[in-house]
Design a protein with these regions (language model features):
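Polar-ligand-bearing catalytic/cofactor-coordination segments
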Residues: 1-94, 104-208
Length: 208
């Protein structure tokens, strides 16, 4: 990633964005001020994980499929809706501009129904980026403390109920992320790293 940008803001956030020559990691100035150097390295490792693992591309593909699925479901159901309620709506064809509010309503409904799958996919990417950060830094303590700081700063609830997680959480709950930071250390147990092929040791060989 050729560029790292700082952004003035009030919350704590960092993200990777861009494709090709526009790719960059963005760190809000608040996260630079509030986290220790070790914690910032973990955050950078997390964002590097998103980039190295191609999460932006996967998200673009998944988002496109999600859009197509929503449009396909509208195509399947719109005819029945018009036959059933068209007289009340004042139009009988989707080609009528007056049908636009109905299309928006139907797409919003299908998006809501499909959101648990989309959010689960997002949480998986975030979890794997956390794993990447731990494997590249080997720093369990700073990883956990970074999420503790995020929890305190955002006044977040670290362990929400399963229903909230299912329908609202694009990231794993902070409590789960802290637990993972504390408990994931295959390098101390002689186990292979899942993403060791992306790292090099002092001799230039991939880490195992």
């Amino acid at each position: 990633v050729p560029f790292v940008y700082g952004v003035q803001a009030y919350g704590l956030n960092a993200y990777v964005t861009g494709i090709g020559g526009t790719k960059r990691i963005v760190l809000w100035d608040t996260i630079i001020k509030k986290l220790t150097p070790g914690e910032l390295l973990v955050v950078m490792g997390h964002e590097m994980g998103h980039y190295v693992l191609g999460h932006i591309w996967y998200s673009l593909i998944y988002g496109s499929l999600f859009l197509l699925l929503g449009l396909w479901l509208i195509h399947l159901t719109a005819g029945w809706v018009l036959r059933r309620f068209g007289g009340r709506f004042g139009f009988t064809e989707l080609g009528d501009i007056a049908s636009l509010p109905l299309l928006i309503l139907m797409f919003s409904l299908f998006s809501f129904i499909m959101s648990p799958a989309a959010l689960a996919y997002s949480r998986h990417h975030e979890h794997e980026a956390d794993r990447f950060a731990l494997e590249i830094t080997h720093d369990n303590h700073d990883c956990a403390m970074a999420f503790v700081t995020l929890t305190e700063n955002d006044l977040g609830y670290p362990r929400p109920g399963w229903l909230y997680k299912l329908w609202r959480s694009s990231h794993p709950p902070l409590g789960e992320r802290i637990d993972f930071c504390n408990n994931y250390h295959p390098w101390t147990e002689g186990k292979p790293l899942k993403y060791g092929k992306y790292f090099q040791n002092d001799s230039g060989d991939p880490q195992q």
